[in-house]
């Protein structure tokens, strides 16, 4: 089968991502049971527009945002040209759905999702992923999130998750803090079926080495469309069980303060390192929608140190470092012994 996009590629991906936005919003409203999303449609002067949906002050979610955008233009931003110089001089099209959820309860993790598609002349690619940021560590929650996304990837090809999991660890990393933003998930970018799966620049990374071992997979446009469809569809099953398990856990003022402190790391990553934020600002995107990912409240504290042996300590030392969450028996034993397994 041809690797070229079908003639209706733009319409097809747009409809997939609109449906993803709808399904997630309906699911989250059912889960929250109190608040509803408000929608704001917007137009971009240079071409295109989108629909931003935000839920505030719910029973579970302090703030939840689910954005859809479909934008096009003539001049490509430098961030794209530097990665794919052959796209220069072509009109471009980009569509995506992104989501960030900030729950009130510190025992329910923040979660992020983004699936996107890009075309410019002969150049096209899919990108996407989902990642989880707990504030209090529970290994079973982490495992459920990874399991659902692993299964979604393996429906397309059994080797994809072997690269996308470590690529996520690599991408969502705060270099200035030397720690991960959370416990990862999956991440992929610039997927057009050509070459090796890993398109990053770090030849020392686990994702790069796994990609070398696997070789070329020869995926086509339809395979990659199915990947976005499967992974987007896996989100609610990966996250809803965590909410149901944690929503009635009582928390202290100190635990809420720690959640806000760790949210500060989320802000730092999104404003300093995130390519999506940079792309949006470089292409004159809608600032309110681009910065929707930021939490409504966060805090910073100079020189904070968690008490040794506390849950906050385990979060900082173990759950902000890449791990083999599914298979590491030593990690499992440690979590069980220290009441951070389930």
Curated annotation (Swiss-Prot):
Keywords, in A-Z order: Chlorophyll biosynthesis, Cytoplasm, Heme biosynthesis, Metal-binding, Oxidoreductase, Porphyrin biosynthesis
Pathway listed: Porphyrin-containing compound metabolism; protoporphyrin-IX biosynthesis; protoporphyrinogen-IX from coproporphyrinogen-III (O2 route): step 1/1
Cofactor: a divalent metal cation
Name of this protein: Oxygen-dependent coproporphyrinogen-III oxidase
InterPro entries reported in the protein's UniProt record: Coprogen_oxidase_aer, Coprogen_oxidase_aer_sf, Coprogen_oxidase_CS
PROSITE patterns assigned to the protein according to its UniProt record, in alphabetical order: COPROGEN_OXIDASE
Site feature Important for dimerization, where: 176
Organism: Prochlorococcus marinus subsp. pastoris (strain CCMP1986 / NIES-2087 / MED4)
GO biological process, one term: protoporphyrinogen IX biosynthetic process
Organism classification: Bacteria, Bacillati, Cyanobacteriota, Cyanophyceae, Synechococcales
Protein family (similarity comment): Belongs to the aerobic coproporphyrinogen-III oxidase family.
Subunit structure: Homodimer.
Name of one Pfam family that matches: Coprogen_oxidas
Keyword Lipid metabolism among record annotations: no
Binding positions for a divalent metal cation per the UniProt entry: 102, 112, 146, 176
UniProt-listed HAMAP family: Coprogen_oxidas
Catalytic activity: coproporphyrinogen III + O2 + 2 H(+) = protoporphyrinogen IX + 2 CO2 + 2 H2O
